[in-house]
Regions:
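Conserved catalytic/switch belt of AAA+ P-loop NTPases
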Residues: 91-130
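Conserved alpha-helical scaffold flanking the Walker A/P-loop in AAA+ ATPase domains
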Residues: 65-105
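Walker A/P-loop
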Residues: 23-56, 135
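An amphipathic alpha-helix signature
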Residues: 6, 146-154, 169-173
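AAA+/P-loop NTPase substrate/partner-engagement loops
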Residues: 46-78
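C-terminal alpha-helical "lid" subdomain
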Residues: 156-163, 170-228
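A short helix-turn-beta junction within AAA+ P-loop NTPase domains corresponding to the substrate/partner-engaging
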Residues: 126-143
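Pre-Walker A (pre-P-loop) alpha-helix and adjacent loop at the N terminus of AAA/AAA+ ATPase modules
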Residues: 1-24
Length: 228
C-alpha cells in the first residue's frame, strides 16, 4: 500500500509539468466499505504538498450525477484542482467521451480520480480503454487479514477513549472470523460498525454502575460481553 502511494505521488508530479490532464490521473479501487473515499480525502492534501500547492479546488461527484452534465464547464471551474468521480463504472459513453476530450485540453493540470469497487473499475477500463490510458497510476486497496483488522480495532478504540481487554480481543477475533467470507471479505467499515456498537453498549452500561470500567490510563475497557 505504501509503495502504491509513493508511485502515485511520483506520477502526479511528472504529470504536473503538462497543463493538460492527459497523465497523472489516479484510479482508486477496493471492496465495499474499504475506506476508498477516506483514502482519497487524505491523498489529495498529500498531492498538494508534493506539488507545493497551498490549497486547491476539489469536487466529489457520483458518476450517475455527472452523466449529462457539461464536463467542459465543470473542468473550467476546477482548473488546477481535483475532480473525484465515485462509482465511476456508472459513467455513460457520452460522458466518458466528453471527459476524455476535455482532459486533452488545458485544464491547468487538473487531476481526475476515479473511484469504484474492483469489479466495476475493471468493467470501466475494458469499456473505455481510451479514457483509461489517461489514468497512469492506481491504488488497489487490499483485502485485510484478521490480524490487520484487529490491529485497526486497537487503534480505533483508543482514539475514541476505549481499550479492549484480553477476553474482549478474543471475542472480536471470533466475531471477525465468523463474518470473514471468501466471496465477501471483512472490511474496515464493518469492523468499525462492530466497534461502534461495542463502545455504545459499554457506554450505556456505565450509567447503571457506580464504578466505571476505566483503566489506569483513563481508557474505558471493552469486555467480552460488549461484543455479544
Amino acid at each position: 500500500m505504501k509503495e502504491q502511494l509513493v508511485d502515485v505521488l511520483c506520477d502526479v508530479q511528472k504529470g504536473a509539468a503538462d497543463k493538460t490532464s492527459q497523465t497523472g490521473n489516479v484510479i482508486v479501487m477496493g471492496g465495499r466499505e474499504t475506506g476508498k473515499t477516506r483514502l482519497i480525502s487524505s491523498l489529495i492534501p498529500a498531492i498538494c504538498r508534493e506539488l507545493n500547492i497551498e490549497a486547491s479546488k476539489v469536487a466529489y461527484i457520483f458518476a450517475e450525477d455527472l452523466n449529462g452534465k457539461n464536463i467542459a464547464e465543470i473542468a473550467s471551474k476546477l482548473a488546477g484542482g481535483f475532480l473525484v468521480i465515485e462509482n465511476a463504472n456508472q459513467l455513460s459513453q457520452e460522458t466518458a467521451d466528453e471527459l476524455d476530450e476535455v482532459m486533452n485540453g488545458n485544464t491547468k493540470s487538473m487531476i481526475v480520480i476515479l473511484e469504484d469497487e474492483k469489479i466495476g473499475m475493471r468493467k470501466l477500463i475494458a469499456r473505455y480503454p481510451k479514457l483509461a490510458k489517461k489514468f497512469t497510476s492506481m491504488i488497489n486497496i487490499p483485502v485485510f487479514t484478521n490480524d490487520e483488522l484487529v490491529n485497526f480495532a486497537k487503534v480505533y478504540t483508543m482514539e475514541n477513549g476505549f481499550r479492549i481487554d484480553q477476553m474482549g480481543m478474543l471475542a472480536l477475533y471470533n466475531l471477525i472470523g465468523i463474518n470473514q467470507k471468501e466471496d465477501q471479505p471483512m472490511c474496515i467499515g464493518t469492523v468499525k460498525t462492530m466497534l461502534d456498537n461495542a463502545m455504545a453498549k459499554a457506554q450505556g452500561g456505565l450509567f447503571k454502575r457506580s464504578k466505571k470500567r476505566v483503566d489506569r490510563d483513563g481508557f474505558t475497557v471493552l469486555l467480552e460481553k460488549d461484543f455479544s
